[in-house]
Amino acid sequence: MERNIPEISVIVPVYNVEQYLAECISSILSQTFTDFELLLVDDGSPDRCGEICDEYAEKDKRVRVFHQENAGLSCARNKGLEHASGTYIAFVDSDDYVTSTYLQELYASLPADKSQRGTVICGFDKLFPDGSLHTVHVPQQTILPTDCSRVLAELVGKHVMYAWAKLYDNRLIKEHGIRFVPAVSGLEDMLFMLDYLPYSDFLLIRDISNNHKDIYKMKTSSK
């Protein structure tokens, strides 16, 4: 039976995050926006992450699981991109979580003319071990990718050169074969953005900062 094409593919690379994974997956499956698929890429995790992913896939048909030998964060995300069928792409780290309106607010920010292809960016909350919270606000605006210097100043200056807290157009990604660069640690998100942005019709920055929760700790996503 032919599978319906979802509007959004949510890609989660998974590695050694057993204590956080259930909260992450549950937060995505609880979205008010329901037209999405969830791609969980188990990057050879040594703990029970692979089993947890399979358990969720058995309970929810929107969940698709891919198991691979450990190859690193970039390769795990690329595996998700390889299999993503949605019109749009969102990344969530497996040790973070999102509020129930996260996808809805990103999707609602897109232009009415869906033939335009670009990027929506939002702020996020950073949660610290002591329970304190720091909200990273971004100035609400629209930037044309042709203004490269302004794009870089806004993104780098506001510390939002992460793959997550964004909605990408999968048509651009597929058409231009855009991927994360393997074996690059710490810069893979920025390099992906720099490959992607020149093809975008727009860059929408929206100050919906409380929807993505980045848990500040020693990051344990795919190594």
Language-model segment annotations:
Residues 1-223:
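Nucleotide-sugar donor-binding/catalytic module of glycosyltransferases
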